[in-house]
UniProtKB/Swiss-Prot annotation:
<keyword id="KW-0378">Hydrolase</keyword>
<dbReference type="GO" id="GO:0003676">
    <property type="term" value="F:nucleic acid binding"/>
</dbReference>
<dbReference type="Pfam" id="PF03838">
    <property type="entry name" value="RecU"/>
</dbReference>
<dbReference type="InterPro" id="IPR011335">
    <property type="entry name" value="Restrct_endonuc-II-like"/>
</dbReference>
<keyword id="KW-0540">Nuclease</keyword>
<keyword id="KW-0460">Magnesium</keyword>
<dbReference type="GO" id="GO:0006281">
    <property type="term" value="P:DNA repair"/>
</dbReference>
<feature type="binding site">
    <location>
        <position position="119"/>
    </location>
    <ligand>
        <name>Mg(2+)</name>
    </ligand>
</feature>
<keyword id="KW-0963">Cytoplasm</keyword>
<protein>
    <recommendedName>
        <fullName>Holliday junction resolvase RecU</fullName>
        <ecNumber>3.1.21.10</ecNumber>
    </recommendedName>
</protein>
<comment type="similarity">
    <text>Belongs to the RecU family.</text>
</comment>
<dbReference type="InterPro" id="IPR004612">
    <property type="entry name" value="Resolv_RecU"/>
</dbReference>
<keyword id="KW-0227">DNA damage</keyword>
<dbReference type="GO" id="GO:0006310">
    <property type="term" value="P:DNA recombination"/>
</dbReference>
<keyword id="KW-0255">Endonuclease</keyword>
<comment type="function">
    <text>Endonuclease that resolves Holliday junction intermediates in genetic recombination. Cleaves mobile four-strand junctions by introducing symmetrical nicks in paired strands. Promotes annealing of linear ssDNA with homologous dsDNA. Required for DNA repair, homologous recombination and chromosome segregation.</text>
</comment>
<feature type="binding site">
    <location>
        <position position="87"/>
    </location>
    <ligand>
        <name>Mg(2+)</name>
    </ligand>
</feature>
Length: 200
């Protein structure tokens, strides 16, 4: 399937053979991706009436569809309707929350190239309208997950734009962010950090 951005450029996804993974059924479930862990966490928060947070769908314009069988449709070409903003949004304690989730295999830093300008602008707008914007970053080699307020991400982005570092060091994330605790339910307890940082 061919997917294109609004400007007509082709979206190139790394084409690798799909491997069937057996999920580990351990307490930490280290085989789970950050997105899967957050989706499970958000489902827990919703089912226990703690918060209402959902993953935003990526808006696609489908252009070409093949029907190899009557009951099957295969999308062959699609375009991104518009640049996506952040991954998740919702409401907690009457406040709008909006966040991006990112993973890195780097040991010592998080590359700012993992963000796009429109995501930074979106986070600025959320803050300007008194919403809560942040980023959840997972260092997969350490299995450590941090919550970093968007104002810090914006500051590091501005530093990059003025000729500074093109990444956020792990030390800076540890200093300005909060280490999230991981467990069974909720899997990634970011709400307890929101309580400490934004509601105390």
């Amino acid at each position: 399937m061919t997917i294109r951005y609004p400007n007509g450029k082709r979206y190139n996804q790394a084409l690798q053979p799909q491997k069937t993974k057996m999920k580990k059924h351990t307490y930490g479930n280290r085989g789970m991706s950050l997105e899967e862990e957050l989706n499970e966490t958000n489902q827990y928060y919703l089912s226990h009436n703690i918060a209402c947070v959902h993953k935003k769908p990526t808006p696609l314009q489908i252009v070409k569809v093949d029907y190899p069988a009557r009951s099957a449709a295969v999308v062959r070409e699609a375009y991104f309707k518009q640049p996506s903003t952040t991954d998740y949004n919702g409401v907690y304690k009457g406040k709008y929350i909006d966040f991006e989730a990112k993973e890195t295999k780097n040991k010592t830093n998080f590359p700012l190239q993992n963000f796009h300008l429109h995501q930074i602008e979106h986070m600025k707008q959320v803050i300007a309208h008194d919403g809560i914007a942040f980023v959840i970053i997972k260092f997969t080699l350490y299995n450590e997950i941090y919550l970093l307020d968007a104002k810090h991400v914006i500051s590091f982005w501005n530093r990059k734009d003025t000729g500074g570092r093109k990444s956020i060091t792990k030390q800076e994330i540890e200093e300005h962010g909060s280490l999230l605790s991981c467990g069974y339910h909720p899997r990634i307890d970011y709400i307890s950090i929101l309580d400490m940082v934004y509601f105390s």
